[in-house]
From Swiss-Prot:
Keywords: Chromosome, Nucleus, Telomere. It is found in: Nucleus; Chromosome, Telomere. It comes from Schizosaccharomyces pombe (strain 972 / ATCC 24843). GO terms for cellular component: chromosome, telomeric repeat region; CST complex; telomere cap complex. This is Protein ten1. Required for telomere maintenance.
Length: 102
């Protein structure tokens, strides 16, 4: 199994189509299996229909997403987890440090 690349939402457009990604985002909207996540001024649309039966989504909730980027820029979600209580500054620092090592 291929590992997911840990990124920020604003880096999704720079990733290859089909690439497996992992990122954190705040729920801006959710309707009919389509999720809009934001982080600062960046946003991404995610299709959660594959995991839909197992998903409970609340507006403004922070979510940890693993999915594949489609050609149209939407991310097909493979795994979704709540990130309630996450220390955002520490998380951002950890992602930046990890990216420097990759």
């Amino acid at each position: 199994m291929d590992s997911a690349k840990l990124i920020f939402i604003n880096q999704i457009n720079d990733c290859k189509d089909g690439q497996k990604l992992r990122f954190l985002g705040c729920v801006q909207s959710y309707k009919n299996g389509i999720l809009r996540l934001i982080d600062g001024s960046s946003s991404v649309t995610c299709d959660v229909t594959v995991v839909l039966p197992d998903v409970s989504i609340q507006k403004h909730e922070w979510l940890n997403i693993v999915g594949r980027k489609r050609q149209d820029g939407i991310v097909d979600v493979l795994l979704i987890r709540s990130a309630v209580g996450i220390n955002l500054p520490r998380y951002r620092q950890m992602v930046s440090e990890r990216q420097k090592c990759d």
